[in-house]
Amino acid sequence: MGMTMIEKIIAAHTNRDKVKPGDIVNARIDFVLGNDVTTPVAVKEFNKIGIDEVFDQDRIAIVPDHFTPNKDIKSAEQCKFIREFARDKGIHNYFEIGEMGIEHCLLPEKGLALPGEIIIGADSHTCTYGALGAFATGVGSTDMAAAMATGYTWFKVPSTIQFVYNGELKPWVSGKDLILYTIGDIGVDGALYRAMEFTGETIENLSMDNRMTISNMAIEAGGKCGLIAPDEKTFKYLENRAQRDYTPCYSDDDAEYEKVIEYDVSDIEPQVAFPHLPENTRPISEEGDIKIDQAVIGSCTNGRMEDLRIAAGILKEKQVHHDVRCIVIPGTQDIYKQALKEGLIEIFIEAGAAVSTPTCGPCLGGHMGILARGEKAIATTNRNFVGRMGHPESEVYLANPAVAAASAIKGYIAHPEEVL
């Protein structure tokens, strides 16, 4: 019996010929990531270990993206603490304000997440890099500290659920809709501690930006990671980016899966996830014209160039509804610059949107768009838990960038066709 992609990656990092689901292993780590929320705790734990140096100054990234630019004194102190740690330890991939982006948009862009690697990050959406064929997963700050010290961490080898998507997507349906539909089907615990492997002709036809959106939300189904096999699109994306040599891994034809779930995507509409779980999905034809107060376009889920182009295409020569606050957040500085070159930022501003420097900001209820009691937002983010974007009595509806932009214009959750 052959091995799945996740099993092959783990075997290669544990000097084993074969691993199987349930094995407990100590694996070599290729890259370690932290942000301004999780790294301070990791640094404190690292300092307790009693060593002076990190395992590799080139294989750690610290990205202050959650509460930055610093929203208050506490966030400023946290960033100062991790900035000084990075300087003291000679960590080369510390991304300062003005250079940084949302971490899961930034690392692929910088060529720091690569096929066949094991990447851990003290952030749950580290699974984004599965779109590049990496076993990338979120860990706690203590595990981040240990990995910074040793270059290793332990895993229980997960079993794999394969998700096969076939058919042609309808207009205005994207990777965001595929993953929301999937989570709506299997539930927020439907892939608990499983490797989710996304495949099929539909996945092959998706852009890298859309693939990253899908892998990004694997954790919202409980997934340990969200893997997509590297192909020519992957290798093209990594040309002139990759900072290291890499070895892609692929599932064997006779690999054993826990289950295989198949979808015909041809009838899938744009999806909307209702409060207060990403599994509460409905096709947009059934959403019922829900009035909104805010629209957020951005995040590590949908803050990439393709997302901004789609949103700008909807908003061009139109106006945001007078009762709606529309916030657009490019994922990185390079994305911001490219959007400037293409005239997208001007489109957003002329439509009445506020355009922010890269930040996680409103996604986690941090800053730059907090909701008051009773307010409703449509967002291209990844979570809509109680109080996620502000007051516990506010509501967040998840959707793709086209739906978010159309809704900003109409003042209620709307299909893009309503404004075109």
Swiss-Prot record:
According to its UniProt record, which cofactors does this protein need?
[4Fe-4S] cluster
Its domain of life?
A: Bacteria
InterPro entries on file: Acnase/IPM_dHydase_lsu_aba_1/3, Acoase/IPM_deHydtase_lsu_aba, Aconitase_4Fe-4S_BS, Aconitase_4Fe-4S_dom, HAcnase/IPMdehydase_lsu_prok, Homoacnase/IPMdehydase_lsu, IPM_dehydratase_rel_enz, IPMI_cat
The record, for SUPFAM superfamilies, names: Aconitase iron-sulfur domain
Keyword terms of this UniProt record: 4Fe-4S, Amino-acid biosynthesis, Branched-chain amino acid biosynthesis, Iron, Iron-sulfur, Leucine biosynthesis, Lyase, Metal-binding
Q: Which GO terms describe its molecular function?
A: 3-isopropylmalate dehydratase activity; 4 iron, 4 sulfur cluster binding; metal ion binding
Q: In which pathway does it act?
A: Amino-acid biosynthesis; L-leucine biosynthesis; L-leucine from 3-methyl-2-oxobutanoate: step 2/4
The record's listing under Gene3D superfamilies reads: Aconitase, domain 3
The annotated subunit structure for this chain is: Heterodimer of LeuC and LeuD.
Tell me the protein family, please. Answer: Belongs to the aconitase/IPM isomerase family. LeuC type 2 subfamily.
Checking HAMAP family in the record gives: LeuC_type2 (MF_01027)
**Protein name listed in UniProt:** 3-isopropylmalate dehydratase large subunit
Organism in which the protein naturally occurs: Halothermothrix orenii (strain H 168 / OCM 544 / DSM 9562)
